């Protein structure tokens, strides 16, 4: 009987917290696969010439393609949106569950088949060695003749459907299921970030679906959408892909903004500085994200006027981003800061995300980008905002909320060891890439001239440090989950909530908090609210 109940609970779950837990477990599993791929990349690049991959350039490209897809679609998005989003959005707005609980279930269960298809694509024929952009003509039937690219396309379709359904669910939930008195301008910033992200997904994913479906018919049904021989244009694919691809990078980072806002507010023991400005900054970033896509295509032969516009528009995004950075700093300023692991990750996020943003402003210049496009400078830039922005935000959220999710508090010592090893590791890995890029080392090539050896060796050494940090994290997770259940306080950070601009009442208790999750037990009951909470 136990077995059947367990199977029913986890396979057919309609409970947002259980589904959020499934997403988190899935993303940790996928993240380990993606990390393994990244280590293969760095080991191959540890020296010039052939190291590990038999001089097989196709295999190298299959690995970087899989690394990108897994890290984006199966680590960051499931963890932030699926994991923390499903777990905390209903709790934070005082809703009993998501609006469509069964839709929520299939949103999760579309992801494992998608991951299997993606990993499977690497094992048939020569693999999909296209890079995550899947540009034709390289991805066309002439240059990738097997079924690999088709499997990767189906994988993307499934992951896309999953995200779309999840987004519909989030938008409906946040707009319609808030507790009495919980107006939009009283929502926690994390809920706002999930709402904005869901809208971006809903608007951008259909364009990607159309682009890769046309690629599928080009490959299998002899259409010529991207083939000049039949009146098509491969640049059309680039426009369609990046119209999705650029909002996608904001889809990755905006939930991170939301997490960082919650964490910085708690550990500064102050309300966030400029709440409304933070909301409108996130919304502005979301809108601007849709009108800058061609900055990925400066080298493709666009009109000079077009390039001038995209340069200007891209730089405008730095303004709302700067508003967020300085509002976080203003929150910290004069705060009675509590130095715990989540706070370290949040401070690391601020510093490293800012570096990534500055290199982004450089790359926004069309004239300079002609020199830096497709070099390691670009790799350094987006790994600073992803590997040290999104992932640091993820870990901040993990250490911040793990006690709330499991009822067991993490080990502070190993948490801080994890932070410092990871902080050192990722910087040693990615900072030298700026120098390689400025010297013209191209991306996506497994071999390089001897002159580039020094920085590559340092970079590969950094990836070993990062691996150690990942092992420390997994050990800390093991320590957390294997300890006996402690009676963890509802508000276990003990941050006084009198400063909060949004006091929440639940029942006749006098507990109030900056957001509603801290008035519930740790872990919350299977059905969190027996009666409606009220927002004062």
UniProtKB/Swiss-Prot annotation:
The keyword Nucleotidyltransferase does not apply. Cu cation binds at residues 246, 295-296. It catalyses: 4 Fe(II)-[cytochrome c] + O2 + 8 H(+)(in) = 4 Fe(III)-[cytochrome c] + 2 H2O + 4 H(+)(out). InterPro entries: Cyt_c_oxase-like_su1_dom, Cyt_c_oxase-like_su1_sf, Cyt_C_Oxase_1, Cyt_c_Oxase_su1_BS, Cyt_c_oxase_su1_dom, Cyt_c_oxidase_su1_bac. The keyword Cell division does not apply. Pathway: Energy metabolism; oxidative phosphorylation. One of its GO terms (biological process) is electron transport coupled proton transport. Its main location: mitochondrion. CDD domains: Cyt_c_Oxidase_I. The chain crosses the membrane at residues 21-41, 62-82, 105-125, 151-171, 189-209, 240-260, 272-292, 310-330, 343-363, 382-402, 417-437, 461-481. It is a multi-pass membrane protein. Heme a3 binds at residue 381. Fe(II)-heme a binds at residues 67, 383. Keywords: Calcium, Copper, Electron transport, Heme, Iron, Magnesium, Membrane, Metal-binding, Mitochondrion, Mitochondrion inner membrane, Respiratory chain, Translocase, Transmembrane, Transmembrane helix, Transport. It is found in: Mitochondrion inner membrane. Binds 2 heme A groups non-covalently per subunit. Binds a copper B center. It comes from the Eukaryota. Its cofactor is heme; Cu cation. GO terms for molecular function: cytochrome-c oxidase activity; heme binding; metal ion binding. Component of the cytochrome c oxidase, the last enzyme in the mitochondrial electron transport chain which drives oxidative phosphorylation. The respiratory chain contains 3 multisubunit complexes succinate dehydrogenase (complex II, CII), ubiquinol-cytochrome c oxidoreductase (cytochrome b-c1 complex, complex III, CIII) and cytochrome c oxidase (complex IV, CIV), that cooperate to transfer electrons derived from NADH and succinate to molecular oxygen, creating an electrochemical gradient over the inner membrane that drives transmembrane transport and the ATP synthase. Belongs to the heme-copper respiratory oxidase family. NCBIfam families: CtaD_CoxA (TIGR02891). This is Cytochrome c oxidase subunit 1. It comes from Allomyces macrogynus. The lineage of its organism: Eukaryota, Fungi, Fungi incertae sedis, Blastocladiomycota, Blastocladiomycetes.
